[in-house]
């Protein structure tokens, strides 16, 4: 049997027999690593340590020290849950139970559970873990598998789809429990240090609302009790910062049933924040040489066929029949921008050409996947597309990265960066891919940006740089992407005249500074816990007259601060109640005025940190507001600086 070459994470290569397992590869590297091997990652896929490698591949060995080990442990925790469930509810039908970032979920049918049942199941899970039951992989024939699941249509569905080419079929066994599964898993249940069941929700089989409704149970799993306790504390804080809760408290947005799922309504205060975000993005775009464009909400499907979206994305599109002609609400803005570029003749001297648009798009996500502002049907992208020569990629991506980091700095956000390179199936020649990836690496390294390399994770039409925002609680959220595109210019036959006086195809670069306004708004609500910086706050200053006697002075102050969003609290409340209301609404500044302030024509300033300064000259405070706003400082700092 011929040898194959496996490439290790450090780039070194190892020659092994063509049927070598992941564990064999580990022992070739060293006996200590071989003994510690839990699983492996082969060409990006997490697999069992006993999985054979038959072709040249990239191989990563997974041990208890690896990041991937957590997914293995949590997958095993899902099996412990399923075993405990079947002991308590033998008639329950198991479907799928994948790992998540903090634990797992398991979808089940034919059983009614409520939150009170979780404690009983959790107690049984702990008994299974304490028993330290070995977890082993076994293979069974397809006939045996179908016979085993003759009363479980969900497992039969898996056998007919994901496992259609498997014979024999992989199962994992632990004592009296077995499950159709590819793994990998830990060696025994005792390796799972700490678990808890979190909550129950509903889900559709396959995420399709036309299928059966299932019961979904979420759980958390960690190596130690201390890690679990830390997670539960973070989870508690996250619930307090939930953007849906704060959005309702501050009257920022709503998603009522009558409007339809995933279709948010922005209330006046929410729209004020979005306007500020849009204005900031617009200023960065204009400064970087982008020109504003606008495209309609729908196009004839001929455009989507030319762009390739109709072929690959039609199930996620909203289609309309208009006078016997088919139209589609746009799921993306890029075909419209490519069409604008195509309306002109371009020379190499004109490039790069840069467009930007706050473009509303529509994507038909499954209803079960919709969640607040993070997953919606209708959302707006601060979309930018630029068209350049291949040799201009590095300079243009550098400018985009500068703008993205300006956004991060402005909002006090951290980001994790990843470079995703050419996948197995791609369009475009070797030379243009190698040139593009080299230029992207050069940008990242010249700016000293730490990044993860994700081989093969690029889009089929070009490599990309992905950003994940990290908020105040250390959680990561999908952020901007800088995506090179060799496909759309080809589909639209976009050209420019080169120095050699012949036609050349430009490279298209997709980029957004926020990602989408909806998701970024969600991140900001939770990151700031509703305590927005002055420049974003919908109500920037609240004037609190002690009595109606000061209302005239209050209106004079409001007029002098007319370049800010100022309100007057004129309800017949005590001063204490007025202050509490402003605090609850996270207003950055309060101006308190009584008879003394009226007589001296001064103000008392209180910030939301409950600090106060008296005898303040209004013009001094006004000047400070301008400075704090223009510099987009994150916290109200008048008291600190005066």
From Swiss-Prot:
PROSITE patterns: AA_TRNA_LIGASE_II, TGS. It is found in: Cytoplasm. Catalyzes the attachment of threonine to tRNA(Thr) in a two-step reaction: L-threonine is first activated by ATP to form Thr-AMP and then transferred to the acceptor end of tRNA(Thr). It catalyses: tRNA(Thr) + L-threonine + ATP = L-threonyl-tRNA(Thr) + AMP + diphosphate + H(+). CDD domains: TGS_ThrRS, ThrRS_anticodon, ThrRS_core. The lineage of its organism: Archaea, Methanobacteriati, Methanobacteriota, Stenosarchaea group, Halobacteria. GO terms for cellular component: cytoplasm. Binds 1 zinc ion per subunit. It comes from Haloquadratum walsbyi (strain DSM 16790 / HBSQ001). The gene is thrS. Keywords: Aminoacyl-tRNA synthetase, ATP-binding, Cytoplasm, Ligase, Metal-binding, Nucleotide-binding, Protein biosynthesis, RNA-binding, tRNA-binding, Zinc. This is Threonine--tRNA ligase. InterPro entries: aa-tRNA-synt_IIb (IPR002314), aa-tRNA-synth_II (IPR006195), aa-tRNA-synth_II/BPL/LPL (IPR045864), Anticodon-bd (IPR004154), Anticodon-bd_dom_sf (IPR036621), Beta-grasp_dom_sf (IPR012675), TGS (IPR004095), TGS-like (IPR012676). HAMAP family: Thr_tRNA_synth.
């Amino acid at each position: 049997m011929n040898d194959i070459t496996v490439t290790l994470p450090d780039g070194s290569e190892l020659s092994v027999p063509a049927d070598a397992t992941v564990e064999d590869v580990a022992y070739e590297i060293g006996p200590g690593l071989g003994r510690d091997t839990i699983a492996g990652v082969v060409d990006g896929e997490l697999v069992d340590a006993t999985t054979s490698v038959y072709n040249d591949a990239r191989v990563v060995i997974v041990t208890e020290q690896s990041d991937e080990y957590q997914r293995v442990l949590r997958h095993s925790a899902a099996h412990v849950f399923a075993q405990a469930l079947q002991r308590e509810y033998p008639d329950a039908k198991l479907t799928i139970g994948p790992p998540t970032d903090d634990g797992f979920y398991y979808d089940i049918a034919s059983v009614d559970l409520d939150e009170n049942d979780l404690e009983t199941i959790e107690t049984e899970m702990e008994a299974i873990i304490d028993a330290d039951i070995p977890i082993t992989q076994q293979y069974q024939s397809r006939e045996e598998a179908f016979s085993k699941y003759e009363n479980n249509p969900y497992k039969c569905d898996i056998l007919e789809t994901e496992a259609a080419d498997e014979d024999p079929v992989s199962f994992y066994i632990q004592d009296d429990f077995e499950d159709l599964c590819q793994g990998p898993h830990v060696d025994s249940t005792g390796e799972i240090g700490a678990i808890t069941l979190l909550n129950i929700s509903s889900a559709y089989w396959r995420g399709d609302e036309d299928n059966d409704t299932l019961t979904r149970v979420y759980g958390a799993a960690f190596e130690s009790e201390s890690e679990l306790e830390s997670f539960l504390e973070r989870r508690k804080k996250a619930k307090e910062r939930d953007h849906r809760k704060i959005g309702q408290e501050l009257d920022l947005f709503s998603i009522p049933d009558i409007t339809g799922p995933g279709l948010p309504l922005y209330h006046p205060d929410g729209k004020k924040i979005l306007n500020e975000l849009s204005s900031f993005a617009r200023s960065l775009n204009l400064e970087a040489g982008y020109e504003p464009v606008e495209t309609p909400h729908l196009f004839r499907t001929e455009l989507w066929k030319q762009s390739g979206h109709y072929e690959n994305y039609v199930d996620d599109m909203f289609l309309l029949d208009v006078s016997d002609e088919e139209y589609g609400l746009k799921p993306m803005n890029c075909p419209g921008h490519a069409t604008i570029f195509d309306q002109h003749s371009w020379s190499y001297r004109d490039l790069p050409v840069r467009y930007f648009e706050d473009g509303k798009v529509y994507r038909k996500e499954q209803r079960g996947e919709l969640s607040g502002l993070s997953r919606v049907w209708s959302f707006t992208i601060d979309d930018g597309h630029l068209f350049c020569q291949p040799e201009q990629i590095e300079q243009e991506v550098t400018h985009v990265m500068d703008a993205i980091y300006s956004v991060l700095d402005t909002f006090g956000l951290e980001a994790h960066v990843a470079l995703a390179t050419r996948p197995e199936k791609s369009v475009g020649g070797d030379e243009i891919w190698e040139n593009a990836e080299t230029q992207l690496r050069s940008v990242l390294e010249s700016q000293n940006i730490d990044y993860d390399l994700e081989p093969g994770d690029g889009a089929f039409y070009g490599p990309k740089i992905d950003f994940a925002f990290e908020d105040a609680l250390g959680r990561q959220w999908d952020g901007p992407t800088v995506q090179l595109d060799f496909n759309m210019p080809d589909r639209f036959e976009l050209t420019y005249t080169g120095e050699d006086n012949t036609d050349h195809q430009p490279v298209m670069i997709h980029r957004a500074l926020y990602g989408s306004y909806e998701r970024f708004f969600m991140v900001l609500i939770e990151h700031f816990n509703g305590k927005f910086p002055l420049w974003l706050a919908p109500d920037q200053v609240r004037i609190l007259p002690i009595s109606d006697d000061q209302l005239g002075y209050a209106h004079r102050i409001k007029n002098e601060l007319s370049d800010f969003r100022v309100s007057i609290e004129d309800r017949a409340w005590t001063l204490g109640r007025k202050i509490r209301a402003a605090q609850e609404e996270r207003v950055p500044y309060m101006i308190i005025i009584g008879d003394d302030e009226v007589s001296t024509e001064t103000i008392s300033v209180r910030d939301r940190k409950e600090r106060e300064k008296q005898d303040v000259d209004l013009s001094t405070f006004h000047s400070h507001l301008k400075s704090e706003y223009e510099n987009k400082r994150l916290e109200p700092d008048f008291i600190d600086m005066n």
